[in-house]
């Protein structure tokens, strides 16, 4: 597969290997285990805990359930039934919320099996190791006067009740692109391996036992929506400084809605060159990032939970006129509104344990969106990636239905968005036909690439067959 999609593919393959692809939701109703996961997650995310910037004894608008124990009918399904417990753990792991749900069960008095307890311990340990290593990196960047902006999970984790509840696989940090060589040299000197440098818009560094940093030179790049690339091309000018009195070759000032405690929590207390977005801009960014995955491989319940956690703390103070104006520019206004409405319905103070009533409370559009989240898993699925690619191609070509032939043609002869990752091909376009030949030969002599090709062919057949079946069913 091309470098443009290599990270997404790796995540999809890892997700399938770890928890299996066979878990899915019924076409008409929500799977009982999936419903229990949502029900228990709503208790976990609303449980008492210290959210970002929240002092002891303060609520800060956090929605806390008056009765924090789930219904006994739900708990009884997992108290003594090992198969039910295993199915729930696998479902939660697939969506990367097994720590949140497992902790909720423990707090309700259930004894977790060892394999689930081990996952919680490892997740908490990983979160603590990430925090220490990230602080070291930020201190070094401070000393080098390299500006940086912690992204996504680094910020969102502080809106969850306790350490490790918001599980993370890596640390995403935007930094001064002009300093990439210094950053690479430093990471290598610290024992990291450069898994990918100079490909796409971020560099990937990994080190045992768990360390994984994605150092972003830009928020979006080649292959992403051009509106997003342009919108975030001047992001530096819209950032706010964690310490406004210190200048690190960037513009910044403190967010009105961001507390000193939150800033310290995000950047480890040493943030002279650290930056953050305003609350509104951060929300817009995570919405665009969520939509990137939602419309690509798909994305799971953790994404919806992230939105609830953030909105639960911030919604009353957010300027939604500004948010909707900016989301319209990015082409994600409809997604933002639908997503915001759904996360509240799924996670806010849900205490009545009744799957049928819950399903009836959702509109047809909300039900379809929720089932899409449930069927994707945290990293999406391979078939979802193929389906969304074919749908995008159908719209681009103005066709009435998905075409296998058109899909294969674009895969063998991809557009310029792929070639732009190869400076030689951009400069000497006459070499592109030779690259086509090289890709075909490389596939013939690589078992891994041949296996991937056959897997893709099967997925394309399945997607087109499902479309034909749906058309016949609607006749």
Regions found by a protein language model. Give the residues of each.
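Conserved NTP-donor binding/palm subdomain of two-metal-ion nucleotidyltransferases/polymerases, i.e.
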Residues: 2-57, 61-169, 175-475
């Amino acid at each position: 597969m091309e470098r443009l999609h290599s990270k997404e593919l790796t995540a999809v393959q890892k997700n399938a290997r770890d928890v299996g692809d066979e878990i899915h939701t019924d076409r008409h109703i929500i799977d009982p285990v999936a419903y229990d996961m949502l029900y228990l997650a709503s208790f976990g995310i609303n449980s008492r805990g210290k959210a970002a910037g929240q002092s002891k004894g303060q609520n800060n608008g956090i929605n806390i359930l008056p009765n924090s124990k789930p219904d006994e009918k739900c708990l009884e399904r997992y108290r003594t039934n090992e198969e039910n417990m295993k199915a729930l753990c696998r479902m939660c792991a697939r969506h990367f919320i097994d720590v949140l749900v497992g902790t909720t069960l423990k707090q309700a008095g259930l004894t977790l099996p060892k394999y689930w307890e081990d996952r919680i311990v490892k997740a908490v340990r990983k979160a603590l190791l990430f925090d220490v290593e990230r602080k070291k990196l930020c201190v070094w960047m401070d000393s080098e006067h390299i500006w940086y902006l912690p992204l996504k999970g680094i910020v969102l984790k502080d809106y969850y009740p306790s350490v490790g509840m918001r599980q993370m696989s890596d640390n995403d940090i935007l930094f001064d692109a002009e300093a990439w060589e210094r950053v690479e040299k430093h990471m290598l000197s610290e024992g990291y391996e450069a898994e990918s440098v100079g490909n796409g818009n971020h560099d990937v560094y990994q080190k045992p036992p768990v360390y994984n940093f994605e150092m972003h030179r830009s928020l979006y790049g080649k292959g992403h929506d051009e509106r997003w690339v342009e919108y975030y091309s001047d992001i530096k000018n819209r950032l706010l400084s964690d310490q406004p009195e210190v200048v690190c070759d960037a513009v910044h000032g403190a967010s009105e809605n961001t507390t000193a405690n939150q800033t310290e929590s995000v950047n480890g207390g040493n943030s002279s060159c650290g930056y953050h977005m305003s609350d509104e801009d951060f929300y817009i960014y995570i919405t665009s990032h969520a939509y990137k995955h939602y419309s690509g491989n798909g994305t799971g319940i953790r994404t919806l939970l992230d939105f609830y956690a953030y909105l639960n703390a911030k919604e009353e103070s957010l300027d939604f006129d500004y948010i909707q104006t900016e989301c319209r520019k990015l082409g994600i206004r409809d997604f933002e509104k639908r997503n915001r409405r759904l996360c509240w319905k799924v996670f806010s103070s849900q205490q009545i344990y009744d799957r049928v009533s819950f399903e009836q409370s959702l509109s047809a559009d909300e039900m379809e969106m929720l089932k899409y989240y449930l069927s994707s898993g945290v990293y999406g699925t391979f078939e979802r990636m193929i389906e969304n690619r074919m749908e995008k191609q159908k719209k681009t070509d103005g066709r009435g239905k998905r075409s296998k032939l058109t899909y294969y043609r674009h895969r063998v002869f991809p557009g310029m968005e792929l070639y732009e990752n190869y400076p030689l091909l951009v400069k000497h376009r006459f070499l592109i036909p030779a690259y086509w030949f090289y890709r075909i030969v490389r596939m013939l002599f690589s078992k891994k690439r041949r296996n991937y090709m056959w897997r893709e062919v099967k997925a394309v057949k399945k997607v087109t067959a499902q479309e034909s079946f749906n058309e016949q069913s609607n006749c």
